[in-house]
UniProtKB/Swiss-Prot annotation:
GO terms for cellular component: endoplasmic reticulum. It comes from the Eukaryota. The keyword tRNA-binding does not apply. It comes from Aspergillus niger (strain ATCC MYA-4892 / CBS 513.88 / FGSC A1513). This is Hsp70 nucleotide exchange factor fes1. The gene is fes1. The lineage of its organism: Eukaryota, Fungi, Dikarya, Ascomycota, Pezizomycotina. Functions as a nucleotide exchange factor (NEF) for Hsp70 chaperones which accelerates the release of ADP. Required for fully efficient Hsp70-mediated folding of proteins. Residues 18-34 have a biased composition (Low complexity).
Length: 287
């Protein structure tokens, strides 16, 4: 039986019993001063929703995620859906429903969204869902979401995204050592690799303060576009020459620029750049 329906049944039995008991007491008490019990006492919004056929909170969570993933919903309404979603998962029961509803994977995938506000809200929702919730904290490890959050916290170009990523990391690691160890392994250069006790709040706070103060170093790379998918030709110097059709600026951090040079993969999507990769030329790689 639906838990809300079961609660509704218990409430109705209790209310009927109390009403009968109250009636008997009134018959035995001629003063008639006993106030009737409030019939709505004990009813929850979820029970009323079940009674009147409204959508359950699980239904609302699924509907919000559908809106977030839909190409037909504009950014403004996506952010409204995200705000509603975040409020729903403030309840630990709803946060624990993310897994059976199949919502964890799409939520984590939204950390890669092209819109900064979508990345910000995804990190915010993750931080809310995992707070004081070991089951949800473990799910971030299973989904390999912690390295992504560290990357957002230290390298995203938008400050509010970095801020919410730190919030998510803070919620994920407190009192949960496996998550703390995973974050420690994912920290960029300049951070200690020494083990941090997830139960030591002073040590955790010190790491979070350092992440909040982190200032990414950015470099502008020029990615040359090809006129056609034909193979590049060779110049007299032996260097590959790619037919060009303008350039586009891609603002990335130093580590990501070096990764692009080494792997030939797009810094944002991770897809292979093919011959374009040979034309990536960082104007500056600061040390």
């Amino acid at each position: 039986m639906d838990p809300n329906m079961n609660s509704l049944l218990k409430w109705s039995i209790k209310a009927a019993t109390e009403e009968q008991s109250s009636g008997e007491n009134n018959n035995n008490n001629n003063s008639g001063n006993n106030a009737p019990a409030d019939p709505s006492r004990g009813l929850t919004p979820q029970m009323l929703s079940t009674l009147f056929g409204g959508p359950s909170e699980a239904d609302l969570m699924k509907a919000a995620m559908e809106a977030l993933r839909s190409d037909e919903v504009d950014l403004e309404n996506k952010l409204i859906a995200f705000d509603n979603f975040e409020q729903l998962i403030e309840s630990i029961d709803n946060a624990n429903n993310l897994e059976p509803l199949g919502l964890w994977t799409p939520l984590v995938e939204l950390l890669d969204h092209k819109e900064p506000d979508m990345r910000r809200m995804a990190a915010w929702c993750i931080g809310t869902a995992v707070q004081n919730n070991e089951k949800a904290q473990d799910k971030l490890i299973v989904l390999n979401a912690l390295p992504k959050l560290v990357s957002l916290a230290t390298a995203d170009t938008t400050p509010v995204v970095r801020k919410k990523a730190v919030y998510a990391i803070s919620s994920a690691v407190r009192n949960y050592q496996p998550a703390m160890d995973e974050v420690t392994k994912s920290l960029p250069e300049g951070y200690s690799r020494d083990k941090i006790d997830a139960g030591d709040m002073d040590a955790v706070d010190a790491l979070m303060d350092k992440l909040r103060a982190h200032k990414p170093t950015f470099v502008t790379c020029t990615v040359d576009r090809m006129l056609s998918p034909s193979k590049p030709t060779s110049s007299s110097s032996g260097e590959h020459v790619v037919p060009l059709r303008g350039t586009r600026a891609l603002r990335v951090d130093r580590a990501r620029a070096l990764t692009m040079l080494a792997s030939g993969r797009h810094a944002v999507t991770g897809t292979r750049l093919s011959y374009e990769a040979q034309a990536i030329r960082p104007h500056l790689i600061p040390k």
